[in-house]
Amino acid sequence: MTTLNEILARAGASDANRDEWLAERRLGLTATEAKHLYMGGSIDELALLKVLPASDNFKPNKYLSWGKEREPMIARDVAMEYPFLAHESRVFKSAVNDRYLASPDMIGPDGDRIALAEIKTSKHDLTPGSLHFDSTGYYYQMQWQMFVLDADYCVFAWERHHDDWSTCPDGVQRPQTIDPVQCVVIDRDEDCINGMIVVADKFFKVMDEIQKDLLS
């Protein structure tokens, strides 16, 4: 059984230092990337992006900015229901392969089990099992996180907004929330995880071949 202290010892850079955080994420496969590949994304394209000279291709938009702004508040709501969960911002490495990476939004011990939380904001209903939830691949993202951190379950927390960015009284573009934060427990799915590992290892094989060709 993996302890929380053992998991925390595998933590790397925090997104508070964006350059270090991005540099560390480029060395392996993150949960978002593992989800993308498992849903049919191009292994070759992602491998090239990893190997080519580093650049920050991240392009923020109002939805991502809103999610980042709301995350600490949603985390506080989650902690009201799950007080053992603490907000987290670091990159974690797997004990079995340090190129398997994940950055959960919350982590904590639930008795002898390890729990995570993943936080999202959306204009859509993200109830697990709904068509929109299934289309996002968030289920796979959470499975990869649980695998990397040896967690037993993940609390999926989401907050819905009305997607109207023109009504804020202070003149700043922000939507209004239309539902309280919703939380659903997602259990670990070993069959899904095993399938994702197969895809991840194919990705690393391609990535290593590209690096070898560039050095030859």
List the predicted regions and their residue ranges.
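Charged, glycine-rich intrinsically disordered N-terminal tails and low-complexity linkers that flank
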Residues: 1-69, 163
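Alpha-helical structural motif
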Residues: 3, 39-44, 70, 74, ...
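Intrinsically disordered, low-complexity boundary segments flanking structured domains
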Residues: 7, 34, 73-75, 144, ...
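Nucleic-acid nuclease catalytic cores
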Residues: 64, 82-104, 108-210
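Gly/Pro/Ser/Thr-rich low-complexity, intrinsically disordered segments predominantly at protein N-termini
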Residues: 66, 70, 75-77, 81-85
